[in-house]
Amino acid sequence: MAEKYSWMLGDLSVREKDQLEVFRSFEIFPQGNGVAWDLGAGSGIQSIPLEDLGFQVLAIDLSEKLLSEIKARKPDTKIRTKVADIRSRELYQGVSPELLLCMGDTITHLGSEKDWEDTVSLWSSFLSPGSKLILGYRDLSYGKPGDQNIFVVRSEESKIFTCQLQFTQNKAEVTDIFHEKTDKGWTVSSSSYNKLILPLDDLIRTASRNNFKLAKKDEKNGMKFLLFEKL
């Protein structure tokens, strides 16, 4: 389904402008070593605006296909890419960036609350005091166990992307359903996975316990954006 997700996001240049607005509202610009890491970078809708702001960007994702779209969309980019799991201790070595961001709902794709807590701990150990951390995610704590929600994410004459949420105790079971019209009729493909339910207050407390101080927060189209400073 990786090739479907970039289409699902819509006009990526518009998405990049949206992310740039978030960064500017948080007064993000190079101040230290000028290095930014984009965790769960996907096709680069955060990485490209960060480069435009003057950062040297390392885009990290599990999907090599999605990362390859960065160069395809911006042939002259100097963004470096790396296929890696953001939970891996081996990833966090060498000189730490002045800015670490994990957006696009990446943190909710972690396997468990322990994975989330362990990952924040890795960030805290890796980053230097004064470094910035930006998180962007959807707080799914509005759903109660047993609740179900289904909605169309994007549709065109020949393509429909639908998402179904089934809420359990600490997770939401997500099924992405993609309909595409071909010469032979409609085809259907789907992918199911879990998303962590991370209530905003709990997330902030976990960050605080790991020496991250909340500096600013914002919300746009249901996505929460949080800026932390490493103490």
What positions do the PLM features span?
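A short acidic, Gly/Pro-enriched loop at the edge of an enzyme's catalytic core
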Residues: 91-100
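A short glycine-rich, Lys/Arg-flanked "PGG" loop and its adjoining helix->strand segment in the class I
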Residues: 117-129
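Core SAM-dependent methyltransferase catalytic element
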Residues: 210-212, 219-231
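Class I SAM-dependent methyltransferase SAM/SAH-binding core
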Residues: 44-89
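Conserved class I S-adenosyl-L-methionine
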Residues: 1-31, 33-42
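A SAM-dependent methyltransferase catalytic signature shared across enzymes that methylate proteins
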Residues: 156-159, 201-216
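SAM-dependent methyltransferase
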Residues: 134-201
